[in-house]
Amino acid sequence: WVKAVYLTVDGQPALDVADGLSVYEMEYDENGNLVKALHKDAKGDLMLPKRNGYAGVKNTYNEEGQCVKTEVLGIDGNPMFIAENGYAGIENKYDINGYVCEQTFINTEGQICDTRQGMARSTYVNDEHGNNLEQWFYNKAGNLCLNADGVAGIKAKFDSVGNLIEYMNYDVKHQPVLDNNGFAGQRFAYNELGLISEMAGLGVDGKPCASKELVYITRMTYDRKGNLIRRAFYDASGKKLMLNREGEAGWENTYDEHGNLVAYAFFGTDGKPCVSKGLH
């Protein structure tokens, strides 16, 4: 679609309550790629919606149809700096398989700039399936830097079907580092339905470490429909139940025939019912 107009019951221009705008307008190139997405008022003038605060987005494509630049637009139709993000646009580069391998954040003049996330450029290493094996963050001077999560890079591993099974965080010296959540990484296991059945926070030594919830390893059990029926917390050995910060070792969920959660019960390290200190 190229245009959406909000109207009252008598056919007069109306405002979308959530955004405060009247018209969404799209422009496409000859290949069907979205070039512009614009927000307009009832008079057809560009306006700033309530939720995102910009008048539109402009995309630029290369000969392969890949989006190489995305810019945020103001009411004058020119690039607009978004203070919340710390940039006005993003430039993309692609690897031989067509996956993004580099993103550069730019200001209204098209120059590289440091963002609110702490970096000016991100680089990616992808496998042939598009799984992101490595990601590194750089400032506008071209040096590795810590992002808002406190890491300079991430390395990840995936299983044969593309499930993330482990990632580790690294500092500017390529050494494992704890992020703002207190993890240097996480490890995951999956059941036959592809649902996460176990996850563990990792320390800089690659071994399970305690989360902010005071839990080392969390295990999940599901029914045949994929509903979570049990969540349990374990120590670093993975053999003993342990209490989290709320004073529970886990809980069990009960569902009705429609899959609606109708009850849950907390249990302690002895597997017996207990009182939780928190709200869930």
Task: Please annotate each region the language model reported.
Residues 1-280:
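Buried hydrophobic residues that stabilize the cores of well-folded domains
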